[in-house]
Amino acid sequence: MKNLKWVAGVALAVGLAALPVLAQEAAKKEPPKPAPGPSVAVLEQWNEIGKKLIAIAEDLPEDKYDYKPNPDSRTFRAVLIHVSASMYFFTDPAQKQKPRYTDDPKPADLKINNKADLVAFVKKCVQDGADVIKAKGDKGMSESVNAGGPTLIRISDLAYALNEHSGEHYGNLVVYYRNNGMVPPESRPKK
């Protein structure tokens, strides 16, 4: 019995002594992967905010489309149209075209008559921008274009500006959701 306790004690001591070594081995990781190229980094951000806007467009109950927090604010529908249409302030100049919308288009001008039309419009705007970023690649994203400002702007900088603009309006939509007692899709528990 005494030998058994001694053997068990030694085994326990060896096991405990080995834990730090095992933990260090587990902590050793693969070296970090190289940073993504500029176009990949822009595309990841573009798609991330686009995914959030699409999720809201798909999730938002149609009876809330005309909600606005105060009379001077845009409605849910107007914010989604504004943020989506504004993506062409990147997409069009990046292709050396004039932006197709000089101001916020009206739902009737876009033939947006219902939720399905609005969801399709948001998806198209996001996809068109993603397609331009992919087509431009790293070299093309470093080209400069005339986007209507006082100086030329690098295409990647224009994309980052639109990503930021989209994120700001996503924040507006989150507040609209919360004001209506709803939880935005991105804030819900993951299943």
Locate each region found by the language model.
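Acidic/histidine-rich, surface-exposed loop or edge segments in extracytoplasmic proteins
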Residues: 28-38, 97-111
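Acidic/histidine-rich alpha-helical segments that form the ligand environment
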Residues: 45, 110-146, 154-168
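Well-ordered alpha-helical scaffold segments within catalytic/enzyme domains
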Residues: 52, 56-57, 91, 128, ...
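Boundary at the C-terminal end of the N-terminal hydrophobic targeting segment
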Residues: 21-25
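Short, contiguous alpha-helical
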Residues: 43-47, 54, 64-106, 146-191
